[in-house]
Amino acid sequence: MTSQRTRERLIQRLYDEGLSNPQVLEVIRRTPRHLFVDEALAHRAYEDTALPIGHNQTISQPYMVARMSELLLAAGPLDKVLEIGTGSGYQTAVLSQLVERVFSVERIKVLQDRAKERLQELNLRNVVFRWGDGWEGWPALAPYNGIIVTAVATDIPQALLDQLAPGGRLVIPVGAGEVQQLMLIIREEQGFARHVLGAVRFVPLLNGPLA
């Protein structure tokens, strides 16, 4: 079930659901999602659904990975993107093929180590990893043209707003429990423009690094 045919079916479904950026769709097509899930779930890798990866975390639904990537790229190419929540490394791998450099923060060390190995196997070398608290971002390397958060925050972390470059775009799920909204925040000259894009479902963004 990891054949090219199953990948093509996934891409067609994403297109049918309104995703249209050809660059994003091509990267989703060629990125082997089955390498980012447990072997027992590999036969489900190209379903449009989130799957468990251990440690109460999930690999995001392909639709959401593609949509968040499209939102980041909507204003043009990006050279420096911060990802909060490496997780399986799948979103990281997709981003690394769409932007010049990715800086990815993960609080669960074992997940980060696995993600590093997978990206090395795929020869994706433009990603730098940090083990730490995603709420803090990565201030030492700021600012970023784009920031993507792959877990739901109860509110928008001020640290991430501070690390966004002028004109930069932050894509983040915000809320708690069953009430979560995907938001796009753009840094403008006079402040931040905030756009609510619809209901989503993500695991929570937690504080502090975890061994």
UniProtKB/Swiss-Prot annotation:
GO terms for cellular component: cytoplasm. Transmembrane segments: none annotated. SUPFAM superfamilies: S-adenosyl-L-methionine-dependent methyltransferases. One of its GO terms (molecular function) is protein-L-isoaspartate (D-aspartate) O-methyltransferase activity. The keyword Cell inner membrane does not apply. Keywords: Cytoplasm, Methyltransferase, S-adenosyl-L-methionine, Transferase. It comes from the Bacteria. PROSITE patterns: PCMT (PS01279). The keyword Lipid metabolism does not apply. Its EC number is 2.1.1.77. The active site is at S60. Its main location: cytoplasm. It is found in: Cytoplasm. One of its GO terms (biological process) is methylation. It catalyses: [protein]-L-isoaspartate + S-adenosyl-L-methionine = [protein]-L-isoaspartate alpha-methyl ester + S-adenosyl-L-homocysteine. Catalyzes the methyl esterification of L-isoaspartyl residues in peptides and proteins that result from spontaneous decomposition of normal L-aspartyl and L-asparaginyl residues. It plays a role in the repair and/or degradation of damaged proteins. Belongs to the methyltransferase superfamily. L-isoaspartyl/D-aspartyl protein methyltransferase family. This is Protein-L-isoaspartate O-methyltransferase.
